[in-house]
Amino acid sequence: MSEQRQESLQNNPNLSKKDVKIVEKILSKNDIKAAEMKERYLKEGLYVLNFMSSPGSGKTTMLENLADFKDFKFCVVEGDLQTNRDADRLRKKGVSAHQITTGEACHLEASMIEGAFDLLKDEGALEKSDFLIIENVGNLVCPSSYNLGAAMNIVLLSVPEGDDKVLKYPTMFMCADAVIISKADMVEVFNFRVSQVKEDMQKLKPEAPIFLMSSKDPKSLEDFKNFLLEKKRENYQSTHSF
Protein backbone atom coordinates (compact mmCIF):
# COMPACT_ATOMS: atom_id res chain seq x y z
CA MET A 1 0.00 0.00 0.00
CA SER A 2 1.32 3.45 -0.90
CA GLU A 3 2.20 5.97 1.81
CA GLN A 4 -0.35 8.36 0.31
CA ARG A 5 -3.10 5.74 0.62
CA GLN A 6 -2.11 4.94 4.19
CA GLU A 7 -2.09 8.60 5.18
CA SER A 8 -5.48 9.13 3.54
CA LEU A 9 -7.00 6.27 5.53
CA GLN A 10 -5.50 7.42 8.82
CA ASN A 11 -6.78 10.98 8.31
CA ASN A 12 -10.31 9.91 7.32
CA PRO A 13 -12.64 11.27 10.04
CA ASN A 14 -15.29 8.66 9.17
CA LEU A 15 -13.02 5.73 10.07
CA SER A 16 -12.12 4.59 13.57
CA LYS A 17 -8.63 3.27 14.29
CA LYS A 18 -10.07 -0.25 14.22
CA ASP A 19 -11.68 0.39 10.83
CA VAL A 20 -8.40 1.76 9.46
CA LYS A 21 -6.53 -1.37 10.56
CA ILE A 22 -9.13 -3.60 8.90
CA VAL A 23 -8.97 -1.71 5.61
CA GLU A 24 -5.15 -1.65 5.68
CA LYS A 25 -5.11 -5.42 6.23
CA ILE A 26 -7.48 -6.03 3.31
CA LEU A 27 -5.49 -3.82 0.94
CA SER A 28 -2.14 -5.26 2.04
CA LYS A 29 -3.42 -8.80 1.48
CA ASN A 30 -4.59 -7.79 -1.98
CA ASP A 31 -1.21 -6.21 -2.78
CA ILE A 32 0.55 -9.49 -1.94
CA LYS A 33 -1.77 -11.46 -4.20
CA ALA A 34 -1.39 -8.84 -6.97
CA ALA A 35 2.40 -9.28 -6.85
CA GLU A 36 1.95 -13.05 -7.13
CA MET A 37 -0.37 -12.62 -10.10
CA LYS A 38 2.05 -10.27 -11.82
CA GLU A 39 4.69 -13.00 -11.69
CA ARG A 40 2.22 -15.44 -13.22
CA TYR A 41 1.32 -13.01 -16.00
CA LEU A 42 4.99 -12.58 -16.86
CA LYS A 43 5.59 -16.33 -16.78
CA GLU A 44 2.78 -16.81 -19.32
CA GLY A 45 4.14 -13.99 -21.48
CA LEU A 46 0.95 -11.99 -21.09
CA TYR A 47 0.70 -8.21 -21.11
CA VAL A 48 -2.13 -7.35 -18.75
CA LEU A 49 -4.41 -4.33 -19.06
CA ASN A 50 -6.84 -3.18 -16.36
CA PHE A 51 -9.68 -1.13 -17.87
CA MET A 52 -11.68 1.01 -15.44
CA SER A 53 -14.56 3.44 -15.91
CA SER A 54 -18.13 4.26 -14.98
CA PRO A 55 -20.85 1.84 -16.13
CA GLY A 56 -21.84 2.34 -19.76
CA SER A 57 -18.67 4.14 -20.86
CA GLY A 58 -18.13 1.77 -23.78
CA LYS A 59 -15.50 -0.67 -22.45
CA THR A 60 -17.17 -3.79 -23.83
CA THR A 61 -17.93 -2.19 -27.19
CA MET A 62 -14.29 -1.18 -27.48
CA LEU A 63 -13.18 -4.76 -26.77
CA GLU A 64 -15.62 -6.10 -29.35
CA ASN A 65 -14.06 -3.79 -31.92
CA LEU A 66 -10.50 -4.67 -30.87
CA ALA A 67 -11.36 -8.30 -31.63
CA ASP A 68 -11.51 -7.40 -35.34
CA PHE A 69 -7.75 -6.75 -35.49
CA LYS A 70 -5.79 -9.83 -36.57
CA ASP A 71 -2.60 -8.60 -34.89
CA PHE A 72 -4.20 -8.06 -31.48
CA LYS A 73 -4.80 -11.38 -29.71
CA PHE A 74 -6.36 -11.23 -26.29
CA CYS A 75 -8.57 -12.92 -23.74
CA VAL A 76 -10.73 -11.19 -21.15
CA VAL A 77 -11.75 -11.29 -17.51
CA GLU A 78 -15.08 -9.51 -17.13
CA GLY A 79 -16.27 -7.98 -13.86
CA ASP A 80 -19.91 -7.12 -13.15
CA LEU A 81 -22.22 -7.30 -10.16
CA GLN A 82 -24.59 -9.65 -12.01
CA THR A 83 -25.19 -11.41 -15.38
CA ASN A 84 -22.85 -12.87 -18.00
CA ARG A 85 -23.95 -10.46 -20.71
CA ASP A 86 -20.62 -8.76 -21.39
CA ALA A 87 -18.69 -12.04 -21.53
CA ASP A 88 -21.36 -13.47 -23.83
CA ARG A 89 -20.99 -10.48 -26.16
CA LEU A 90 -17.26 -11.04 -26.43
CA ARG A 91 -17.57 -14.79 -26.96
CA LYS A 92 -19.78 -14.06 -29.96
CA LYS A 93 -16.80 -12.16 -31.37
CA GLY A 94 -14.58 -15.19 -30.87
CA VAL A 95 -12.87 -13.87 -27.73
CA SER A 96 -12.21 -16.19 -24.79
CA ALA A 97 -13.83 -14.45 -21.83
CA HIS A 98 -14.54 -15.41 -18.24
CA GLN A 99 -17.21 -13.54 -16.28
CA ILE A 100 -16.78 -12.73 -12.60
CA THR A 101 -20.03 -11.72 -10.90
CA THR A 102 -19.18 -9.88 -7.70
CA GLY A 103 -22.65 -9.69 -6.15
CA GLU A 104 -22.51 -6.45 -4.19
CA ALA A 105 -18.76 -5.79 -4.51
CA CYS A 106 -17.99 -2.67 -6.57
CA HIS A 107 -14.53 -3.79 -7.74
CA LEU A 108 -12.38 -6.76 -8.67
CA GLU A 109 -9.61 -8.02 -6.39
CA ALA A 110 -6.44 -9.90 -7.25
CA SER A 111 -7.75 -13.12 -5.67
CA MET A 112 -10.78 -12.99 -7.97
CA ILE A 113 -8.53 -12.62 -11.00
CA GLU A 114 -6.57 -15.70 -9.94
CA GLY A 115 -9.59 -17.98 -10.30
CA ALA A 116 -10.53 -16.60 -13.71
CA PHE A 117 -6.89 -16.77 -14.82
CA ASP A 118 -6.72 -20.47 -13.93
CA LEU A 119 -9.90 -21.22 -15.88
CA LEU A 120 -8.63 -19.37 -18.96
CA LYS A 121 -5.35 -21.27 -18.68
CA ASP A 122 -7.15 -24.61 -18.47
CA GLU A 123 -9.15 -23.68 -21.59
CA GLY A 124 -5.93 -22.96 -23.48
CA ALA A 125 -6.90 -19.30 -23.93
CA LEU A 126 -3.72 -17.87 -22.41
CA GLU A 127 -1.33 -19.57 -24.81
CA LYS A 128 -3.30 -18.15 -27.75
CA SER A 129 -3.22 -14.59 -26.36
CA ASP A 130 -0.67 -11.79 -26.17
CA PHE A 131 -2.84 -9.67 -23.88
CA LEU A 132 -5.06 -10.41 -20.92
CA ILE A 133 -7.61 -7.65 -20.55
CA ILE A 134 -9.42 -7.11 -17.27
CA GLU A 135 -12.67 -5.19 -17.67
CA ASN A 136 -13.23 -4.01 -14.13
CA VAL A 137 -16.60 -3.38 -12.50
CA GLY A 138 -18.11 -0.10 -13.70
CA ASN A 139 -17.24 2.37 -10.94
CA LEU A 140 -14.99 5.44 -10.72
CA VAL A 141 -14.18 4.93 -7.04
CA CYS A 142 -13.52 1.42 -5.68
CA PRO A 143 -11.42 -0.17 -8.47
CA SER A 144 -8.76 2.51 -8.08
CA SER A 145 -7.90 1.13 -4.63
CA TYR A 146 -7.17 -2.44 -5.70
CA ASN A 147 -3.96 -3.45 -7.42
CA LEU A 148 -4.48 -6.30 -9.90
CA GLY A 149 -0.84 -6.59 -10.97
CA ALA A 150 -1.57 -5.16 -14.42
CA ALA A 151 1.12 -3.70 -16.65
CA MET A 152 -1.17 -0.79 -17.48
CA ASN A 153 -4.22 0.77 -15.84
CA ILE A 154 -6.42 2.46 -18.41
CA VAL A 155 -9.35 4.73 -17.56
CA LEU A 156 -12.25 5.50 -19.88
CA LEU A 157 -14.27 8.70 -19.54
CA SER A 158 -17.30 8.85 -21.82
CA VAL A 159 -18.45 12.19 -23.21
CA PRO A 160 -22.01 11.95 -21.77
CA GLU A 161 -20.52 11.79 -18.25
CA GLY A 162 -19.17 15.33 -18.54
CA ASP A 163 -15.72 16.90 -18.67
CA ASP A 164 -15.43 17.56 -14.92
CA LYS A 165 -14.75 14.04 -13.70
CA VAL A 166 -10.95 14.05 -13.56
CA LEU A 167 -10.66 16.29 -10.51
CA LYS A 168 -13.86 14.93 -8.95
CA TYR A 169 -12.39 11.42 -8.95
CA PRO A 170 -8.66 12.11 -8.62
CA THR A 171 -7.67 8.72 -7.19
CA MET A 172 -8.95 6.97 -10.29
CA PHE A 173 -7.27 9.26 -12.79
CA MET A 174 -3.99 9.35 -10.85
CA CYS A 175 -3.61 5.62 -11.41
CA ALA A 176 -4.20 5.94 -15.18
CA ASP A 177 -1.35 5.04 -17.51
CA ALA A 178 -3.61 6.22 -20.33
CA VAL A 179 -7.01 7.89 -20.57
CA ILE A 180 -9.61 7.29 -23.26
CA ILE A 181 -12.32 9.84 -23.94
CA SER A 182 -14.94 7.52 -25.39
CA LYS A 183 -18.01 8.34 -27.50
CA ALA A 184 -15.98 11.26 -28.84
CA ASP A 185 -18.37 11.73 -31.77
CA MET A 186 -20.78 13.34 -29.26
CA VAL A 187 -18.40 16.06 -28.03
CA GLU A 188 -20.40 18.88 -29.60
CA VAL A 189 -23.77 17.44 -28.57
CA PHE A 190 -22.79 17.50 -24.90
CA ASN A 191 -20.60 20.62 -25.06
CA PHE A 192 -17.79 18.44 -23.77
CA ARG A 193 -14.51 20.34 -23.33
CA VAL A 194 -11.63 18.08 -24.21
CA SER A 195 -9.34 20.94 -23.21
CA GLN A 196 -10.71 20.76 -19.65
CA VAL A 197 -9.85 17.07 -19.35
CA LYS A 198 -6.35 17.72 -20.68
CA GLU A 199 -5.86 20.63 -18.28
CA ASP A 200 -7.01 18.58 -15.30
CA MET A 201 -4.85 15.61 -16.27
CA GLN A 202 -1.84 17.93 -16.43
CA LYS A 203 -2.40 18.60 -12.73
CA LEU A 204 -2.78 14.93 -11.78
CA LYS A 205 -0.87 12.77 -14.24
CA PRO A 206 0.75 14.83 -17.01
CA GLU A 207 2.60 11.85 -18.48
CA ALA A 208 -0.61 9.89 -19.21
CA PRO A 209 -1.58 10.09 -22.91
CA ILE A 210 -5.18 10.92 -23.77
CA PHE A 211 -7.00 9.25 -26.66
CA LEU A 212 -10.23 10.41 -28.26
CA MET A 213 -12.15 7.35 -29.38
CA SER A 214 -15.41 6.71 -31.21
CA SER A 215 -16.86 3.50 -32.61
CA LYS A 216 -17.73 5.60 -35.67
CA ASP A 217 -14.05 6.38 -36.24
CA PRO A 218 -12.12 3.12 -36.86
CA LYS A 219 -8.79 4.96 -37.01
CA SER A 220 -9.17 6.14 -33.41
CA LEU A 221 -9.36 2.52 -32.29
CA GLU A 222 -6.49 1.45 -34.54
CA ASP A 223 -4.26 4.21 -33.14
CA PHE A 224 -5.00 3.02 -29.61
CA LYS A 225 -4.39 -0.61 -30.58
CA ASN A 226 -1.00 0.33 -32.03
CA PHE A 227 -0.18 2.23 -28.84
CA LEU A 228 -0.87 -0.90 -26.78
CA LEU A 229 1.25 -3.06 -29.08
CA GLU A 230 4.12 -0.59 -28.71
CA LYS A 231 3.81 -0.56 -24.92
CA LYS A 232 3.96 -4.35 -24.93
CA ARG A 233 7.09 -4.28 -27.10
CA GLU A 234 8.65 -1.83 -24.64
CA ASN A 235 7.47 -4.02 -21.75
CA TYR A 236 6.16 -0.89 -20.07
CA GLN A 237 5.09 -1.57 -16.49
CA SER A 238 2.99 0.86 -14.48
CA THR A 239 4.80 2.50 -11.60
CA HIS A 240 1.60 3.52 -9.81
CA SER A 241 1.38 2.50 -6.15
CA PHE A 242 -2.15 1.66 -5.07
Swiss-Prot record:
Contains a metal-binding site, which can bind nickel or zinc, with a higher affinity for zinc. His-107 is an essential nickel ligand only in the nucleotide-free state of the protein. Metal coordination and the nucleotide-bound state of HypB directly influence each other. Binding of nickel in the G-domain decreases GTPase activity and modulates the oligomeric state of the protein. Binding of zinc inhibits the GTPase activity. GTP and GDP modulate coordination, stoichiometry, and affinity of nickel, but not zinc. Potassium increases the GTPase activity but has no effect on the other biochemical properties of the protein. Ni(2+) binds at C106, H107, C142. Monomer and homodimer. Dimerization is induced by nickel, but not by zinc. Dimerization is also induced by GTP. Forms complexes with HypA. NCBIfam families: hypB (TIGR00073). The gene is hypB. Gene3D superfamilies: P-loop containing nucleotide triphosphate hydrolases. Residues 48-211 are annotated as: G-domain. The keyword Plastid does not apply. It holds the Pfam family cobW. Disruption phenotype: Mutant has negligible hydrogenase activity and is severely impaired in urease activity. PANTHER family: HYDROGENASE MATURATION FACTOR HYPB, HYDROGENASE PROTEIN ASSEMBLY PROTEIN, NICKEL CHAPERONE. The keyword Zinc applies. This is Hydrogenase/urease maturation factor HypB. Belongs to the SIMIBI class G3E GTPase family. HypB/HupM subfamily. CDD domains: HypB. Involved in the maturation of [NiFe] hydrogenases. Required for nickel insertion into the metal center of the hydrogenase. Is also required for maturation of urease. Exhibits a low intrinsic GTPase activity, which is essential for nickel insertion. Keywords: GTP-binding, Hydrolase, Metal-binding, Nickel, Nucleotide-binding, Zinc. The lineage of its organism: Bacteria, Pseudomonadati, Campylobacterota, Epsilonproteobacteria, Campylobacterales. One of its GO terms (molecular function) is GTP binding. SUPFAM superfamilies: P-loop containing nucleoside triphosphate hydrolases (SSF52540). One of its GO terms (biological process) is protein maturation. Zn(2+) binds at C106, C142.
